[in-house]
């Protein structure tokens, strides 16, 4: 409000015209959803989980090599007999222990072996009370 003394007095007494500000309703900005771009971070390598279903003891060294390279390994022993399964589990348990890794029993015939650099959280309550060293009972 530009004016002199008289305008200020009239304004004080309530006789001046008030300037109304125009209310402009703004339209909400439209959300632009583009395709997400996945970018690999430098220095971060992709973690690859390996799944094995061995048929003979000869395959166990390849499974151990995957653990040594830092990959978590799922081993399915459903198609082999109990004695061979015990030998495979014993070998992989030794490998996992030597690497400072972890073993998680998913069910009586499926195991998850994880190297030291992989953290596995949670627990399978159904199997936690069963003996660890004889998984084929």
UniProtKB/Swiss-Prot annotation:
Cell division protein that is part of the divisome complex and is recruited early to the Z-ring. Probably stimulates Z-ring formation, perhaps through the cross-linking of FtsZ protofilaments. Its function overlaps with FtsA. Belongs to the SepF family. Keywords: Cell cycle, Cell division, Cytoplasm, Septation. GO terms for cellular component: cytoplasm. This is Cell division protein SepF. It comes from Carboxydothermus hydrogenoformans (strain ATCC BAA-161 / DSM 6008 / Z-2901). Its main location: cytoplasm. One of its GO terms (biological process) is FtsZ-dependent cytokinesis. The lineage of its organism: Bacteria, Bacillati, Bacillota, Clostridia, Thermoanaerobacterales.
């Amino acid at each position: 409000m530009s004016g002199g003394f008289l305008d200020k007095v009239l304004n004080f007494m309530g006789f001046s015209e008030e300037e109304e500000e125009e209310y402009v309703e703004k339209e909400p900005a439209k959300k632009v959803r583009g395709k997400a771009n996945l970018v690999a971070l430098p220095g971060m390598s992709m973690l690859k989980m390996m799944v094995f279903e061995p048929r003979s003891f000869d395959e166990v060294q390849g499974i151990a090599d995957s653990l040594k390279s830092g990959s978590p390994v799922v081993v399915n022993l459903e198609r082999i007999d109990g004695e061979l399964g015990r030998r495979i589990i014993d070998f992989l348990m030794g490998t996992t222990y030597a690497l400072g890794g972890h073993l998680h029993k998913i069910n009586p015939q499926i195991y998850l072996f994880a190297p030291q650099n992989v953290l596995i959280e949670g627990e399978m309550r159904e199997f936690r009370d069963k003996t660890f060293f004889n998984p084929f009972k």
